[in-house]
């Protein structure tokens, strides 16, 4: 190689490095793209059994895995002995080290002390990954009995902060920012690693209240195990001012309170995030999206929500088909993690089509510079570059444009390309949902029904 040729390569490499957006190098290898998977809460609440979980895992492996879906996550309550009772009457399975264990009556292979390892191994045999949900802190029962913390000289009472229980969940006390507190988090992370867990969703930690000390302790404990485990923080809304902090320790974090299947405000829960509200929230968080750290717009309540949804009655999603497609489009152009909430086994042809469109999934997994370029009370337009942007490289495959009618009446939306920051006079348009080419256009004009949307790939001259 000549010196001139070598210097040119170095110059190209430096340009590519400087041109790329910031990335979380410590976590980028674990989650270089937004995680995609399924969570049990929206359909099963605290009641899911091993048989039900396996059935959903089998369905994912058969129908979704080839499109990039991989995480199978058991949400809250796997340690609750009587999940269909009132929460005040719950009884828990806690071992002699003060750690929650899965209930054998719902997860039979755990009866011999194997914990979730047999189930995780089953999920892995399908080519998928296994995750579970925890509430921050230490079980109250462990503190009452002052159980020894495994691998340390401390006991539960040493670690517990009795003044800092989760205000909306009575299972645990908080954990002190101390050697004893760290020892407890070390013990549960070690346990989960021994079960071959790949994903931990930690709740009552990202907001109401925000617990940065416990986030740091949990992240440190996970790192000590040596096992790669995604850390997902919940609930939201994570405060924007905490973005740089949470991104140091977690791979994803919730940007809103619980998201359910309603376009506007929900009378039952005024705190529940609506799809309409999610547009403004996503726009604020878009600058913080980066490989290794993904603002999370919450689960996708699609299809059949049952038999025991985490909130409300058994139902088919309340979203219209237009709203379902709009939700998938917003999550994708924003690059949120994609975590399905509906029962997979019950998925119909329409729901399956939303989850298996490779061109839409590519927007979520392989785009960059994602941002809202036009926002009014009734219209939202998002723009992103098509291709990949990593630590040392960037590819350019045109632009993605998402146009949303977020108003309550039909409208025609028109913009010149320059309104969107695009410089060429004419662009070739491809409709990603319909998977068809629409030809060349000198401007953008879309007629949309209420709450409907389109997602386009636009390419200029090459």
For each feature predicted by the language model, list its residue ranges:
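Glycan-recognition surfaces
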Residues: 161-163, 174-183, 230-343
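C-terminal beta-sandwich/jelly-roll accessory domains of carbohydrate-active enzymes
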Residues: 396-398, 402-462
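Bacterial N-terminal signal peptides
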Residues: 10-19
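Structural recognition of the beta-strand scaffold that forms the well-ordered cores
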Residues: 35-40, 70-75, 80, 129-134, ...
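Carbohydrate-binding surface patches
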Residues: 331-334, 339-341, 375-422
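Aromatic-lined carbohydrate-binding/catalytic grooves of carbohydrate-active enzymes
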Residues: 61-122, 126-204
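Catalytic cores of secreted or luminal carbohydrate-active enzymes
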Residues: 326-375
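Sec/Tat signal peptide C-region and signal peptidase I cleavage site
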Residues: 21-25
């Amino acid at each position: 190689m000549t010196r001139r040729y070598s210097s040119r390569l170095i110059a190209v490499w430096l340009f590519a490095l400087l041109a790329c957006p910031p990335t979380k190098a410590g976590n980028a290898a674990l989650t270089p793209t937004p995680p995609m998977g399924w969570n049990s809460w929206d359909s099963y609440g605290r009641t899911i059994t091993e048989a039900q979980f396996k059935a959903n895992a089998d369905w994912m492996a058969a129908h979704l895995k080839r499109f990039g879906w991989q995480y199978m996550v058991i949400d809250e309550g796997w340690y609750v002995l009587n999940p269909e009772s009132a929460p005040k009457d719950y009884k828990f399975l806690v071992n002699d080290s003060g750690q929650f264990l899965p209930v054998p009556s719902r997860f039979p292979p755990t009866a011999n002390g194997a914990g979730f390892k047999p189930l995780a191994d089953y999920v892995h045999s399908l080519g998928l990954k296994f995750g579970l949900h925890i509430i921050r802190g230490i079980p109250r029962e462990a503190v009452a009995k002052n159980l020894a913390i495994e691998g340390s000289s401390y006991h539960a009472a040493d670690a517990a902060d009795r003044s800092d229980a989760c205000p909306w969940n009575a299972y645990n006390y908080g954990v002190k920012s101390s050697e004893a507190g760290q020892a407890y988090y070390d013990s549960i992370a070690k346990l989960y690693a021994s079960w071959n867990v790949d994903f931990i969703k930690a709740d009552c930690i990202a907001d109401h209240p925000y617990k940065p000390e416990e986030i740091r302790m949990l992240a440190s404990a996970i790192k000590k195990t040596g096992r790669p485990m995604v850390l997902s923080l919940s609930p939201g809304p994570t405060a924007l001012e905490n973005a740089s902090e949470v991104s140091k320790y977690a791979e994803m974090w919730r940007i809103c309170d619980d998201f359910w299947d309603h376009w506007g405000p929900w009378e039952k829960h005024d705190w529940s995030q609506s799809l309409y509200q999610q547009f403004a929230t996503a726009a604020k968080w878009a600058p913080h999206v980066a490989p290794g750290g993904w603002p999370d717009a919450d689960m996708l309540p699609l299809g059949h929500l049952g038999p025991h949804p985490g909130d409300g009655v058994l139902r088919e999603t309340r979203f219209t088909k237009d709203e379902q497609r709009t939700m998938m489009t917003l999550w994708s152009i924003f690059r949120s993690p994609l975590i399905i909430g509906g029962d997979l086994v019950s998925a119909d042809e329409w729901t399956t089509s939303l989850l298996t469109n490779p061109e839409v999934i590519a927007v979520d997994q392989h785009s960059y510079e994602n941002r809202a370029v036009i926002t009014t009370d009734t219209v939202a337009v998002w723009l992103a570059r098509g291709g990949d942007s990593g630590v040392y490289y960037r590819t350019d495959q045109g632009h993605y444009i998402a146009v949303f009618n977020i108003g309550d009446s039909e409208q025609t939306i028109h913009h010149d390309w320059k309104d969107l920051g695009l410089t060429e006079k004419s662009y070739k348009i491809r409709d990603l949902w319909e998977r068809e080419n629409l030809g060349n256009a000198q401007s953008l004009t879309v007629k949309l029904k209420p709450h409907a949307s389109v997602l386009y790939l636009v390419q200029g001259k090459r």
